[in-house]
Structure formats: C-alpha cells, structure tokens
Amino acid sequence: MTTSFTAAPGIDVITTTAEIPTLGSLAINAFVVHGAEPILVDTGTVAGQADFMTTLRSVIDPADLRWIWLTHTDFDHIGSLAALLEANPSLCVITSFVGVGIMGLSSTPLALDRVDLVNPGQTVTLADRRLTAVRPPVYDNPITAGFLDDRTG
C-alpha cells in the first residue's frame, strides 16, 4: 500500500508499506520537495510501481518534476525511475559516479546527458535552493547520499 502525507511545508512523503512475513512491515519512503525546480527523492519499489505512480500523481504532476535525487540504486529506490524518465524528457537524475555505473549494469542505464554527478560534499545549485550531498552516518549501501537543503536545513 502506498500513501502520502505532508511532512513540512513544501515537502511531501510518499510511503510504501511492504509486509515482511513474521517480521512486520517495512516503510519505503520517497519525498517530493516542491519549489521552482521540484525534486523527487527516490522513486519507490520495483514491485509497487503502479501504486507509487498513482500516489505521486496525487502529490505532483510528474511532468512538473525537474530532478530526481537517487539516494542509492537499490531496487526499493529506483522502481519508477524508467517510467518517469520516459514520461518527462526534461527530467534529470542526480546521483554519484558509482550510481551511474551501477545503473549501467541494469536494464535501465542512465543517459549521461540526463545526469548530474554529485558526490558527498559537493553542492547542486537549483533555481531556489542549494543542495549539498551528505553521506549519512549509517547506511546499507556505500553510494548512499542524502542532501542538506540550504532553504530548509
């Protein structure tokens, strides 16, 4: 099941709950950061793509997205990536050099003209904000990078 909620002004969360037998459930989150150049952080699970896209459309028209920030390339983060890139020719992906390499091994390699390579410590300047890539203190994938938004902290 995929739902959405507003976490803070200008930030919506799209959360998919995956049931894990005998262990409970796992929340898989993506985020929409609204602004002059809207950003989708991660794109949901491969298995839940249709549900994710329906919920995303309730938050923002995918044609209005300008960026996708891939925190990392695990399958629970790239599920709707190909569909979004196909539907929106102006959409660009922010990821690391290693992220591009890993995607090149998948059935959905990234076209380099639609990628902005960013590694931890580097900053992406958008129309209304600056995003500085940060490596979280704990992660399960060595290419994981979130960001610090200079507008929201």
PLM regions: where:
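Short, structured coil segments at secondary-structure junctions
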Residues: 7, 87-89, 110-111
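Conserved beta-strand hairpin/beta-sheet module of binuclear metal-dependent hydrolase folds
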Residues: 2-58, 145-153
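Short beta->alpha connector loops
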Residues: 45-47, 74-75, 136-140
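Alpha-helix capping at helix-to-loop junctions
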Residues: 90-93, 109, 153
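Short catalytic-loop micro-motif centered on adjacent basic/acidic residues
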Residues: 39-42, 67-70, 133
